Structure formats: structure tokens, C-alpha cells
Amino acid sequence: MGDWNKILTDIGRLWDVYGQAYLKGIQNTLILATVATLAGCLIGLLCGVLNTIPYNKNDNIVKRFFLRLIRIVIQVYVEVFRGTPMVLQAVFLYYGLPYFTDNAVKFTNIWVAAIVVVSINTGAYMAESVRGGIISIDPGQTEGAKAIGMTH
């Protein structure tokens, strides 16, 4: 029982010294997660919908070219940002971009860099979720929607 008293006493002392810092850290984490996740959801929704716009041989060559180009860019974005750890993305964006662009692109605020990193990472994951959801719609449902005048 004496060990538990010592542990609880130590936790109490730590809370007295660092309690406000813990609360501020929790607040910052919740703000970052909320803002960046909402931005990432918007990025993912846009990428997922753009990646599933249908086209065929009868469409204009310019439309087909741009839709293919958009799909390639989105697929590269998704593969790169889903395939690399978020810490690596953060280090590259915060330290690598200023180095490689001779300080032309530099984050002056750590919050902006953090929101950008979490947003683009979340956007890549959400893009695949949206794309998968749209593709999984039964063809009969799509035909029914077109029959009543809905578009993609």
C-alpha cells in the first residue's frame, strides 16, 4: 500500500508543477486535430470526387486529357502522402522546403506548418475513402439516379 501512496504523491506533485502545461497541450492538440481534420476532409472529398468523374471515348479529347491528368496527380498525391510517415512529411515541409527553395517557401508559424501537414495527410486518406465509397455504389443505383435526372 505504501508504494501506491508514493506513486499518487508523485503524480500530485507532477500535476502541481506541470498541470497547466498538460491542459494547454490538450487544448492545442484538440484545436490542431479539429481544424486539420476538417481541412483534410474537404481536400479528401474534392480529390475523391474528381478521381471518379466518368469519361469515355466519345468525350472531348481535352476533357479526357484533363481528367486523366487530374487522376494521375491525385493518385501520386495519395500514394506519396499515404505511403510516408507524417513525421517525415512534417520534417520535410518545415525544414526541407526552405532548404530546397532557398527560403522562398518557409513557414514562419509552426501552427500553419502543423495544420498543413495533418491536413494533406488526412486528405490523402479521405480521398481513398471517398473514391472507394463512390466506386462501391451498385451500378443499378447509378442507373436509377441517372433515370431520375441526377448526374455524377
Give residue ranges: language-model regions.
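Transmembrane alpha-helices and adjacent helix-loop boundaries
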Residues: M1-H152
